[in-house]
């Protein structure tokens, strides 16, 4: 679970992953969704350790959690987390600020892993255009999928992909896997599995948390 980001777009003094929903930080709501896993590796910013430890004992999953410090970039944080993964296991890499993911979806994704990468995605509902050379070019929205997390792999495969990584501008693990020759399978995701990035996202998550 990747929770080392600073979340500057949230305009909050408190890092967004530690904002409370029903008296519990977002990151611990997310951890709860993976409570049936054998081990939960949580990657956080070293500067945030006091925020994390404040709620760790109350989580009920202290014995399952392996706490790891993140790097300067997402890629570095993933690499730090992968060091502690058994190569013979399957791994789900998830954003700490996607607390509405369901356990059903997590299990569906992780059980579908073979020699591939399995990711959730949802189709685009709005019209889309690409801005190129000063022009707005219309594109077929049926060909566009918004990719979510968790992104699931056989641990050795994603470790190998990261060890061969050359393009450090990539923004998700599936892209790293694909650049190493891996195949990606997209499973229909969940509309409410949104990433909390802005104050509006936070309000949407709060509203939906009461319903789910």
Question: Where are the language model's segments positioned?
Answer:
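Residue-level signal for inorganic ion chemistry
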Residues: 1, 27, 81, 94-95, ...
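N-terminal glycine-rich phosphate-binding loop and ensuing alpha1 helix
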Residues: 1-49
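Residues at the starts of beta-strands that form the adenosine-phosphate
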Residues: 38-40, 64, 90, 116, ...
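Acidic helix N-cap motif at the loop->helix transition within catalytic regions
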Residues: 50-55
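Short phosphate-binding loop-to-helix
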Residues: 57-90, 166
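Short beta-strand-to-loop acidic/aromatic patch adjacent to the donor-nucleotide binding site
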Residues: 88-98
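Conserved core of the sugar-phosphate nucleotidyltransferase
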Residues: 100-187
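Hydrophobic helical membrane-anchoring modules
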Residues: 193-212
């Amino acid at each position: 679970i990747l929770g080392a980001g600073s979340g500057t777009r949230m305009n909050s003094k408190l890092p967004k992953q530690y904002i409370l929903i029903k008296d519990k930080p977002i990151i611990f709501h997310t951890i709860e969704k993976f409570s049936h896993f054998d081990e939960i590796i949580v990657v956080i910013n070293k500067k945030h350790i006091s925020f994390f430890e404040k709620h760790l004992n109350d989580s009920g999953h202290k014995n399952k959690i392996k706490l790891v410090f993140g790097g300067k970039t997402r890629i570095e944080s993933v690499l730090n987390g992968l060091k502690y993964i058994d190569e013979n296991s399957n791994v789900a890499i998830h954003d700490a600020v996607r607390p509405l993911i369901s356990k059903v979806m997590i299990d569906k994704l992780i059980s579908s892993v073979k020699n591939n990468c399995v990711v959730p995605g949802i189709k685009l509902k709005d019209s889309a255009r690409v801005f190129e050379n000063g022009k707005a070019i219309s594109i077929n929205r049926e060909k566009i999928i918004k990719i979510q997390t968790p992104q699931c792999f056989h641990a050795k495969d994603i470790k190998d992909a990261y060890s061969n990584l050359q393009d450090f501008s990539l923004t998700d693990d599936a892209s790293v896997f694909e650049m190493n020759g891996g195949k990606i399978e997209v499973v229909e995701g969940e509309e409410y599995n949104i990433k909390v990035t802005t104050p509006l996202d936070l309000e949407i998550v709060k509203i939906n948390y009461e319903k789910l």
